[in-house]
């Protein structure tokens, strides 16, 4: 499995899913709250909120948590106000890295992300330094042993998927952002449980790494994803399969 598989990176970085569930839910709460604050608490009229809720549900986040997050965003309940930031830079080996942040303290987030880059052999760059290497895509991933591959491919394409790939036992469905929700809802209706689902930054090309460099890159991604304010980390690293399984 290559490192550009989002699930592979998350699987390696997060370890046991149950141990990190609270941290994951915290990220969903921030995203849902921000989406509701920006465009209202009605998912049908707010595509970003609708997508955030779909992601939370895919991770089995309780309905009550979702509803509270929406109310915090709309102001019905008190809560922090979050700012969206994107940091760009390089990991060891020249790997391009994008870090998406939601924070209630911009200075804290900037200092922490910068320190994590420098302490792990990376370099934080300026805006635009690596983002041109990525495109925003909808990405949905499934364990190929848990779904009917032929049926999934047929349904996904009918619903508007752009591409479906099977690598290392993971089926990756790629969409343009505009069809992500339609495709995900169609697949969810079949009862298939995804490994991950969301709007991701997908690199145009991937950078192959030797084992030593790959370990350094994965360590850096680990540390970034563990940071409280970090919502997502994307890279163009192609990780050797033995390091992510």
Curated annotation (Swiss-Prot):
GO terms for cellular component: cytosol. It holds the Pfam family Transcrip_reg. One of its GO terms (molecular function) is DNA binding. It is found in: Cytoplasm. Keywords: Cytoplasm, DNA-binding, Transcription, Transcription regulation. Gene3D superfamilies: 1.10.10.200, 3.30.70.980. One of its GO terms (biological process) is regulation of DNA-templated transcription. It comes from the Bacteria. Its main location: cytoplasm. InterPro entries: Integrase-like_N, TACO1_YebC-like_2nd/3rd_dom, TACO1_YebC_N, Transcrip_reg_TACO1-like, Transcrip_reg_TACO1-like_dom3, YebC-like. Belongs to the TACO1 family. PANTHER family: TRANSCRIPTIONAL REGULATORY PROTEIN YEBC-RELATED (PTHR12532:SF6), TRANSLATIONAL ACTIVATOR OF CYTOCHROME C OXIDASE 1 (PTHR12532). This is Probable transcriptional regulatory protein TP_0474. It comes from Treponema pallidum (strain Nichols).
